[in-house]
Amino acid sequence: MTPLERAHYVRDHLPAEGLFVEKTWRIAPQPFALSPAHAELLEKLGIVLHHFNTACNLLYRQSAAGKAHPWVAPLLDAGKPPELIALSRHDKVKGQVPAVIRPDLILTEEAFALSELDSVPGGIGLTAWLDETYSALGENVIGGADGMRNGFESILNGGEVLISEESAGYRPEMEWLLGADRVRSVEDYTPNGKPAYRFFEAFDYPKLTKFAESWQPGVPLTAPLKPYLEEKLWLALFWSRPLQEFWRQEIGEKGQKLLQRIIPYSWVLDPAPLPPHAVIPELGIQSWTEMESFSQKQRDLVLKISGFSPNAWGARGVYVGSDQSAEEWSAQVRIALAEFSEHPRVLQRFAKGSLAKQDYAAENDEIVTLTGRARVCPYYFVVNDRVTLGGVLVTLVPADKKLIHGMRDAILSPAVASAPATI
């Protein structure tokens, strides 16, 4: 097949009902080519992230019980209703951690930069479809043709997907993957003993009256209803000096070094005053308000709502300092400090991805090369502490886009291990 014929094959095999509501993307004739080194890193990363999630769970529980670092649990519980905090601490779920792990990795020359760790991700059905479709074209996609389908079924074990109205745009991909009879609206769902995949955010829970009245801890549900595990604050806590020995003990020295390599330096935007002789590490400032006068170069930072907010997923609630005027940046810093007690923010070094090239079929049926920056999203499935890489979704956006997410002018494709695609 010619490249155009391959792209048409992919387009023509899209499910009639689609995979997302009112969303389209550019179609590539071939998968995105990752270097062997990047592909090898993806194979190693899953178990380390699982150990990190397990360590986060342990740290929170130790903190909540007053056994260690008592400041951690109140920080992670900020803004959450007492009943949800109580559910997340229940003994029947104390050891549970997410069975699906999807990091958002910005592709760089040497490795990746981890911008987020998602345990309730979209894209599972889409990536399964991409893997199957490109495999039919003879491509050796990472995870294999059925890696996503088998991986998701392994953690679902014949169960159902519970999807909220807020996440309804992703319903078609789940119905394609499992069949409409296994995708249920959580707003009118009553637990029936079957395992369930939670495709709704924890902040939706207080509005889900029927589910909240009937669901009990111990009923199989992944990701577990532990909103503290879904906070972006963990990326800042990973860098916290008082916690370094804890991380080394729980994820091992090699795991700690790997995460130090890929997690951009991050801070908790806590307005508590510092002693006069102290400064904020890496930034060299004595107060967060000093950031308001940062130059554009100094504002090469990303400010994010940590979690438990309708603005904490996707590109919502994310502000790239160098893209904003001094006045806009100053306003966001002030809002972040004012809302700390209810909606803590995390501040990260901005990770600028390396440039990569990929062809796609334009609307006029010409094959066009897009030069852009890539977000690489591997999907890991965890069963009995065994971690499997099911597949990889790559989103390539034009180089002028600072935030990488699914958009009309992005290429969405699976990944293969091949020669480097960077320039």
Question: Which residues make up each language-model segment?
Answer:
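Preference for protein termini
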Residues: 1-423
